[in-house]
């Protein structure tokens, strides 16, 4: 079974952080939080899930902050989430299955990112994002805004999805 470090960058996310972390607490092996200057209860909430909380001065560059978060990871793979992302129950199960069966030669796992919903909560817009990235494989985030990792090596398209929920359901 592979191990996974959750690597997050946060700032003033007290309204959504707990929901996010609760949805993945039993799935990941390590939680890394890089705080870029919160002035609310974000840090306090994060301490209920991890003691690996690092300050990083904001540099107008999301990739710099994400790379900082990944630099603290010690597990086989790094996973990123934004504080307003969640794993739904069916995706939690699919993720655990992936952890048990993933071929360790896979460098990047792409996962659907559900970001648009109709009035009934059904997904209306989804696209694949690099979600699990092999740790220390030489890949890094690029782009000050709309940052990405260019997949290198073996890429797997997964069954688990990440759901973007701006506010509490």
Q: Where do the protein language model's features map onto the residues?
A:
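Conserved donor nucleotide-binding strand/loop of the catalytic core
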Residues: 44-72
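A conserved acidic beta->alpha catalytic loop
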Residues: 23, 27, 35-47, 58, ...
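Conserved beta-strand positions in the Rossmann-like core of class I SAM-dependent methyltransferases
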Residues: 32-35, 54
């Amino acid at each position: 079974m592979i191990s996974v470090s959750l690597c997050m960058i946060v700032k003033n996310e007290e309204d959504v952080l707990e929901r996010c972390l609760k949805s993945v607490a039993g799935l990941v092996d390590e939680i890394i939080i890089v705080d870029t200057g919160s002035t609310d209860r974000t840090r306090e909430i994060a301490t209920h899930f991890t003691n690996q909380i690092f300050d990083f001065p904001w540099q107008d560059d999301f990739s710099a902050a994400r790379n900082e978060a990944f630099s603290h990871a010690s597990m086989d793979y790094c996973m990123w989430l934004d504080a307003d992302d969640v794993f739904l129950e069916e995706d939690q199960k699919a993720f655990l299955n992936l952890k048990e069966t993933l071929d360790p030669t896979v460098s990047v796992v792409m996962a659907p990112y559900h970001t648009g919903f109709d009035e009934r909560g059904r997904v209306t817009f989804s696209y694949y994002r690099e979600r699990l990235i092999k740790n220390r494989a030489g890949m890094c985030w690029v782009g000050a805004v709309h940052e990405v990792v260019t997949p290198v090596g073996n890429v797997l398209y997964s069954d688990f999805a990440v759901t973007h929920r701006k506010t509490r359901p």
